[in-house]
């Protein structure tokens, strides 16, 4: 069997207990170093390279608050550590600026629900009260693009009627007809840092 010198892993569902923990314990018993990037499984306590997702969620929300928004819907994928931390940043920004938090404005979803639940919830909210909602914080750009489609189908102008902020600064933000405000994700820098760290292990 081929022996690896090291493995860089991006965990999925990192906010949940990992049922495949034995795979990682086997890697450890073989003496193969590994690093987790973007998130980590807490029970393993591995070496990891992370983005400050809490600060990212704070910056997304702060941007909208500074533009005068007070009724900000937040969509967070909470089976990933990144989502729980971005939600924490969203809450922190509201507290910091003294903006009341409406519990109904916090929408959480799982990886399996990402293609359906957020869009359906936004449609329902818009059908009930289009006037009060003025801004949306999105877990990532992929979600932002999906929600932009919902808004356009309802003839809601962005950012005139509703402002929307993404996360990742992905190619989706670049190709979108709507100029999407998004938090930059230093993907290359993160990868370089992980490579440097694994060489040192």
Question: Language-model segments: which ranges?
Answer:
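Bacterial carbohydrate/catabolite-sensing allosteric modules
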Residues: 1-8, 13-201
């Amino acid at each position: 069997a081929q022996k690896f010198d090291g493995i860089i892993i991006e965990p999925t569902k990192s906010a949940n207990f990992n049922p495949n923990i034995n795979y990682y314990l086997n890697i450890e018993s073989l003496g193969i170093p590994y690093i987790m990037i973007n998130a980590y499984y807490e029970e393993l306590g591995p070496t990891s390279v992370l983005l400050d997702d809490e600060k990212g969620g704070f910056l997304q929300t702060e941007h909208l608050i500074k533009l005068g928004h007070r009724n900000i819907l937040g969509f967070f994928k909470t089976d990933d550590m990144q989502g729980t931390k971005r939600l924490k940043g969203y809450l922190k920004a509201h507290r910091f600026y003294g903006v009341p938090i409406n519990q109904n404005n916090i929408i959480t979803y799982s990886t399996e629900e990402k293609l359906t639940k957020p869009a359906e919830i936004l449609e329902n909210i818009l059908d009930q009260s289009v006037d009060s909602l003025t801004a949306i914080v999105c877990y990532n750009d992929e979600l932002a693009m999906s929600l932009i489609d919902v808004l356009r189908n309802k003839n809601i102008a962005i950012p005139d009627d509703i402002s929307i902020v993404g996360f990742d600064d992905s190619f989706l933000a670049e190709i979108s007809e709507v100029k999407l405000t998004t938090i930059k994700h230093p993907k290359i820098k993160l990868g370089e840092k992980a490579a440097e760290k694994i060489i040192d292990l």
